[in-house]
A protein has these predicted regions:
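Bacterial N-terminal signal peptides that target proteins for export
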Residues: 2-10
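Bacterial N-terminal signal peptides
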Residues: 10-20
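Generic structural signal for beta-strand residues in well-ordered domains
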Residues: 17, 35, 70-73, 117, ...
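N-terminal active-site segment of His-dependent metallophosphoesterases
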Residues: 24-102
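Active-site neighborhood of phospho(di)ester-bond hydrolases with catalytic His/Asp-centered motifs
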Residues: 44-46, 78-85, 123-129, 194, ...
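Well-ordered alpha-helical segments embedded in enzymatic catalytic cores
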Residues: 63-67, 110, 205
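Extended active-site neighborhood of metal-dependent phosphoesterases/phosphodiesterases
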Residues: 92-204, 214-218
Length: 220
């Protein structure tokens, strides 16, 4: 065997051995499970905005909600929450391909589609962040939130809504809403979503909700 061919042969052998060793050292996948059968889970998702602004990243967020959907029973998932900034730009028409390559309508449609995997399976409570308003970073109060996440989008979420405050356009939406959630053990929780930098009227509305006698024993 010629020297050049011999070097190539040894290189292939070494590569195969390294790959075999790496595979052998990989831990066997263990499916998620609860250590206590009486336990239950709440899933908290951070800002999805960066996943929505580029088309190539959108499947990554769908993978997250798909994982949640597949593990609802295994992890006894009772509720999904999100911190807001569902999109990067609320009203961008022509992306420049650098800051984003998806127009706002495409971003909203993408995040709504991802959460749609959970519709009818588990309730989700989504806050509205500063990027979800105006053209860029709450330049105005208008948001497309209610267009893509109306109250009746997910009947599981609709069942736990107790009150809906008015958005800047005077429409009751889940941008400002009160949710009553009861754990499998019967513990009651009061959850509120408030618009980013809430107006004085919304702060007053939230105080009125939390001061109601029927919520005095709720965890919030």
């Amino acid at each position: 065997m010629k020297r050049g061919n011999l070097k190539f042969f040894y290189s292939i052998v070494v590569a195969i051995l390294c790959l075999t060793n790496a595979v052998a050292q990989q831990q066997k996948y263990t499916a998620p499970s609860l250590s206590d059968s009486n336990s239950w889970s709440i899933i908290m998702l951070p800002d999805p905005q960066t996943y929505q602004k580029f088309e190539r990243n959108q499947p990554l967020f769908e993978l997250m909600t798909a994982w949640i959907s597949e593990n609802i029973e295994k992890l006894n998932i009772q509720l999904v929450m999100c911190t807001g900034d569902l999109v990067e730009q609320n009203e961008m028409i022509n992306p420049n391909g650098i800051a984003a390559n998806q127009a706002s309508k495409q971003q909203w449609a993408s995040v709504a589609r991802a959460f749609g995997r959970l519709d009818g399976k588990v309730p989700y409570v989504l806050a509205a962040g500063n990027h979800d308003y105006g053209y860029s970073n709450i330049s105005v109060r208008r948001s497309n939130y209610n267009t893509y996440f109306p109250v009746d989008k997910n009947f599981k979420t609709q069942k736990i809504i107790r009150e809906a405050g008015l958005n800047a356009e005077g429409v009751p939406t889940m941008e400002n809403a009160a949710f009553e959630f009861t754990s499998p053990q019967g513990r009651k929780f009061l959850l509120l979503t408030l618009e980013f930098a809430p107006r004085d009227t919304i702060v007053a509305w939230a105080k009125n909700v939390t001061n109601q006698a029927r919520y005095k024993d709720h965890t919030g």
